[in-house]
Structure formats: structure tokens, C-alpha cells
Amino acid sequence: MAKTKERKALKKGKAAFNLIGRVKVTDKTFNLDNSYDSGWTDNSMYVGVDCGNGNTVYAEMRSGFFPDKDNVIRAYSKDEKDDAGKSKSVEIAWEDRLDESLYDSISDSSFLTVGVEKDVKDKTVYKKFLTAYDAVEYLNEHLEDGMIVNVKGTIGYSEYEGNVSTKKEITSIVLSKIDDEADFKATFSQTILVDSKSIGKKNDDKGTMELVAYVIDYVGKPKIDGEKIEVKKNVTYPKTFEVAINENPEITAKMLQRFFKPKKGKITEITVTGNLVEGGSTVNITEDDIPDDIKELIEMGLYSEEEAEKKIAVGNGNRERRMIIVKPDITYVGTGDDRKPTVAFEDGKYDEDDLYFYEQALLDAGAE
């Protein structure tokens, strides 16, 4: 009897975003002390950042607790290591979460960072929070519409009825030192998997190539038909990206051939960087794009050329949520004098049979 090949464990890589722009605070941005039938109570923030040219990207913060239960916060120790050499996991009682005397022993990666106030010396005041529940409550008091902020966070993926959703969770929101809209941005860095058929069709209108790839994310205990199913594994999600075509198309063609086209049956891992586009276009509007009737308004002095171009940029936008890959990311390997830069790329890291999809993970966990 032939021996069944053991599936190689999937390793989650990078999944991060960075937004710089004007924050958009409305009466729907915050939802405090929202209660559910289960008793769960949470605070949430769903906020947009105008990153220029009508490109408003949304991200969120959310967490809560059960008022009638003993709630704990899981964090990581700053100094203690486990048997694998990783930061040791620690538990903090919910009622101790604001006790700053505990903070010195906790790893910086366990905190959410907020800096949206200035002191009397015009210096940004930074606050650390162990929970989004408290960070959102603070931001509700201090975050103001129109502030120029620098937002960082992680990108998460989930699947429901065959549709893959993307969620951007904020880990840091602080005042930005940038004040020129030309320097606003919405970028991401994401580890993806590609196979021999990932490269899709060219879209001349958008100036991009389709890339049908995969991402890896952790699934804990999803609720299926009202019951929690224990998966606790990294799983694969299909995800379609776009690849920006360079002004010199040969550069893009060479990049795709070198990094995005593994041998048949093999899966390549690569970390890429790119731009997030939501609700607007990142194209630059010039005088040639201004319609004649709007040019008349400029001639009358009712609009400046710059104002008109901004209006047109917004009007030309769409409500798609696009992740447009620009190039491979560069990472560093080694330590000390041996530390060196390298492309974050591993050709043929997995076989096609190693891909472990969400639906299969649910079946293996006992879901019907």
C-alpha cells in the first residue's frame, strides 16, 4: 500500500498595512459598549483615512469582554522565553489591564499604540493599551476629524460561504509628521503563495495584470451554525491581487517570470509590497483630463485648477477594494556582521498538495 504523503505545515508570513492621510471621523466611527445576546460587550472603531486622490481606506479596532465571567488578556513576556526560545505567553486579569506597573515586563508587541494628543511643548503624547476596548474608548475622546495620522496594523482573512473577506486591524494610530498630501499613502506588505497558473489576464484600462494567488492565515475556533468548531491551524485562502504594470512593461514581464511562475505542481512563497485602493483612483489628473465645462468654472475663478483636479480624481474613483502589487519585498537574514538583504522569496517551498483550504479544515474538525 502506497504511503500517503504528509502535508507540509503552512507557515504564516507578513500581512501588514500602513496608511498616512487625513482621518475621517463621523457619528458612525465609534460604537461603545455594544452588547450581544451572549453577554459579550465590546467597543469598536471603524475609521477611514483619506490617503489622497479620493482613496479613502478603512481599518478597524475592536475588542471586549464578558461582564459576568473572569476575563483574561493574553500577552507576551518581554524577557522570559519558552522552550522554543520564543517570548513566553502571559495572562493578565481583565481588571489589571490598566495597571501600568505591569507594563515593563510585557513585550512591546503586545500593546496597541495611540498618539493623537500634543502636550504643552507640542510633543505627541503616546499611550499604550493592552486591549482595543480601552484604546477605542480613548480615541473616542481624542481623535478628531481631519487629523493627519499614521496608521499601522495587520491584515486578516476569513471565509464565509465561499467568499474571502479582508480585515485591516489597527495596532498603531499616531499623528503623522507629514503635512503634504503628495506624501500621503496606503500601502501593504503581504506574503503570498503562487502556482504555475497564478498569472492572469492583462487589464489595459487599469494598467495591471491579474494574479490569482493564495494567502495563509490562522483559524482558531470559528462558529459554524451556532457552534464553535476547533480548528487551530494555519489554512489557505484564495485571493486575487493585481500587479501594477511598469512604464516599461518589460520590467514587469521579467519580474513575473522570475518570481511568480514556479514549476507545475510547485508553490512559491514571496512577500510583496503594494498599494491599497478603496473608493478612488491613484491616477494623477492633469489639465488634459479636465472637461471643457469645468475649465469654464476655472476661468471664471470659481475653482482653482488644483481644486478641480481633486474633484475629478474623486469622481473617477470606484468602490472596489484593490490590492495592487508593485514589487517583491526585501528582507534581512543573518545576524551581526553576517546580516544581509535578500528578496523575500522561496521558490517551490510547497507542493500543491500542501495547500490546506478553509473548507477542508472545517470538515477535518468535524463540521458537517
Question: What feature does the model see in each segment?
Answer:
Residues 1-368:
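OB-fold and OB-like single-stranded nucleic-acid-recognition modules
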